[in-house]
Design a protein with these regions (language model features):
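Short hydrophobic alpha-helical runs that function as membrane-insertion/retention elements
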Residues: 3, 87-88, 178, 199-202
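Gly/Ser/Thr/Ala-enriched C-terminal appendages of enzymes
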Residues: 165-170, 175, 183-280
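Buried, small/hydrophobic-residue-enriched core segments of structured protein domains
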Residues: 2-173, 184-187, 193, 207, ...
Length: 280
C-alpha cells in the first residue's frame, strides 16, 4: 500500500499512526466495496455514526465508506469535513412526539415539503405506508412530491413488495423505498434474491464496525537499509509462521488487468535489482 523512505528514527515514528489510519480505513473501504457490489446499481448510504467505535472512528469510517462506494453519509460532521454528500431521514422520536403518526407526517410535510421521505415503521409498517400515501396526496395537490419511505424493521422483502404495490396503486410510481436494519452484503444479496422492491440501502452497524472482521492485520516492516557507502542492504523478518515472514527489498506493486480492463492480480516486486543497489 505504501513505501516510506527516510532516516530510520523518523520512519519508525510513523509506524503506529500509519497503521492506525491505514488498517482501519482499508478495512472499512473494503467492506463498503463488498456491500456496494451486492447493491449493484442501487445507491448505498452510510448510516453508521451511532454504532461506530467512538467519534474519531465514526469520522474515519464515513470517509472510508465513501471511498469504498457509498453515495452519501448521515454523519453531518464527516460530510462537512470531507465533502461527502449528506442524506438521512427523520427519527422515530419525531413520530412519537406527536399524537399520531399521521399528524407527525403532516407536520413534517409542512416543514420539509420538498424532502418528504417518511420513516414508516414506528408503530405498524403497513399503516405507516398508508399514512405516508395520504400525506403524499396532500403534497401533490400543493405542487410537491412524496420522495419516498424508509423501512427500518420487520421482513424487509415482504414489506418492500407490499409498499411498492400500495405506492404504485396510489400513483406514486417514482417514490423511493429505502431499507435499513443491520444490513450487510449477505442480507442485501438475500433480499434481492427474494425480489425485494428496495431502491436505496442504508447500511450502518455492519459497515462502520466491519462487523464480521473487526481488525485488519496490516504491518509495517523494514525492507532495506542503506549503509554509510550508499549501498542498499536488504532486510527480512523471519518467523515460524509463514504469514509473518516479510519480503525484503525496495518494494513496489504492479497491477495487471485483462484486455477488458478488469483486475487480474497484483505483483509485488523489488525495484532495486542486485546490479543497481547503489543509489545516488
Amino acid at each position: 500500500l505504501l513505501r516510506i523512505q527516510g532516516p530510520i528514527v523518523e520512519c519508525q515514528l510513523l509506524e503506529t499512526p500509519l497503521l492506525n489510519i491505514i488498517n482501519f480505513q482499508s478495512l472499512i473501504a473494503t467492506k463498503s466495496a463488498r456491500i456496494k457490489c451486492s447493491a449493484g446499481d442501487d445507491p448505498v448510504i452510510e448510516f453508521g455514526l451511532r454504532r461506530a467505535q467512538g467519534p474519531n472512528g465514526a469520522l474515519g469510517a464515513s470517509r472510508a465508506a465513501y471511498v469504498g462506494g457509498t453515495e452519501a453519509t448521515s454523519n453531518v460532521l464527516a460530510a462537512k469535513k470531507y465533502g461527502i454528500p449528506v442524506k438521512g431521514t427523520h427519527a422515530h422520536s419525531w413520530i412519537m412526539s406527536f399524537g399520531s403518526e399521521l399528524e407527525a407526517f403532516e407536520k413534517y410535510a409542512l416543514a420539509m415539503p420538498n424532502n418528504c421521505l417518511f420513516l414508516v415503521d414506528t408503530y405498524d409498517t403497513i399503516e405507516g405506508i398508508k399514512n405516508a400515501i395520504q400525506v403524499g396526496l396532500q403534497l401533490k395537490k400543493k405542487g410537491h412530491r412524496l420522495v419516498g419511505i424508509r423501512l427500518d424493521s420487520g421482513d424487509l422483502a415482504y414489506l418492500s413488495i407490499e409498499a411498492r404495490k400500495l405506492l404504485d396503486g396510489a400513483g406514486f410510481t417514482d417514490a423511493l423505498i429505502i431499507a435499513s436494519n443491520d444490513l450487510s452484503e449477505e442480507i442485501i444479496d438475500s433480499l434481492k434474491h427474494q425480489g425485494a422492491k428496495i431502491n436505496i440501502w442504508g447500511v450502518g452497524t455492519k459497515l462502520v464496525t466491519a462487523y464480521e472482521q473487526p481488525a485488519l492485520g496490516g504491518v509495517y516492516k523494514l525492507g532495506a537499509i542503506r549503509d554509510f557507502e550508499g549501498i542498499w542492504e536488504y532486510r527480512i523478518k523471519l518467523s515460524e509462521q509463514i504469514i509473518k515472514v516479510s519480503n525484503p527489498g525496495i518494494l513496489q506493486v504492479r497491477r495487471f488487468k485483462n484486455t477488458e480492463g478488469l483486475f487480474i492480480g497484483d505483483m509485488i516486486y523489488n525495484t532495486a535489482q542486485p546490479e543497481d543497489r547503489k543509489r545516488q
